[in-house]
Amino acid sequence: MHILLKIVIFAIKITKMDDKAIIKKRIDWFCKNKINAFSPTISPAPKSVERNEIESLYEGLRWFVDRGVNELLVQKKYMGSYCDIYLHKELTDSYLVSRNGYKINHLNRTQWLAALTDLHARFSWSGTAIRIIQSELMPWSALGKGLIANEFSAYYISHQIHADYLQQSDLYAKITQIRQKPEYKAFVADAKTLSSKELKDKYPNHIIRQYQSVRDMKLLDLPNYTKNISLFKKELDIFGKEAPIYFKPFNILKEIKDDGTEVFVNDNLSFQQINDDEFLHYTFADEADFEAKYPEIRAWVDKMNANEEGVVIKPRKAFLPAMPPAFKVRNNDYLTLIYGVDFQDRLQEQINKRNIKGKLKCSINDWAINAKLLQTPYADIHEENYEFKNLVLDRILGEEIENQLDSRL
């Protein structure tokens, strides 16, 4: 089937004309702006009920080892905004691309170019024109300031106001007094044994409404509630603070040479060329070797987790068939920021219902498409390259599936 016809057939599946126009515009924009990659979604590591871990370091490592991927990296997970850096020999020609494939144009160009100076200086540029580098744009507030203020800070303030009111009022004391009264206890006992009609015959309607409200009201453990709010605020202060723009690069995707030839790097160890942060690199001979080495990996992660989001687990080889790019293992303190102040109180419930199957499938598919996008020569990205446009379309359609998943995963 002709590739252009395939694009049309796929587009027919999009029901709204407005959506078709937007998607066509996005695809054309990809080509016009020379976007060579499209970030994948990253799945959390599998849970471990036995270890009481919602995102299990052990299970994430074991998942790869069980599938024959024995050379793995464990790196710090940075809490910012994902971006691809198109780093040019002439630094001022460089540009940034967001997670969804949009050129980032609304940041202060002078500031972010200055923040790339050290990264640029790490390389010899003899014979190389461009390097495409995966990175985290830091801090989170650089792109997420509005989200932080409107959602996370507002959420914290609402809970703090609620806690302050409960501590300062006598509401809980009054409810406790009512619950201790003999007549209330008699009502509760009757409500368990009498039919609805019998209960109405015995008690006036206003008494039934009052006692049912008192019975059904959940009283918070105020010391625990305030502790959870404080934890949420601590995490918000750590990750939501404002600071000058900087980058945490973590993988070189490919290099474009002056003569147009390209090097598809495909090696997560490129991290050490572009980042001085400590990371782990292990090769496991077999299952017993993994079990023997796991405690030292666990100890390193526990030490590193203080005031951080967590870690990512990656194969040494970046692109492997039917494999995700990474698993993320976020710690419980950070997950309080994502799931809310009662996350740790409801941890067992969250573990029981956690299901990463859909997220993992999307991650594997996204990464496979990204490999094909990157294998398209940079010089061949233009509006007449229908094979490339078809890959972009596949990836955009994949977003619709991802949008149906729990956004907190």
Label each PLM-derived region with a short phrase.
Residues I23-R26, G60, F64, W112-R122, ...:
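Generic structural signal of hydrophobic/aromatic residues within well-ordered alpha-helices
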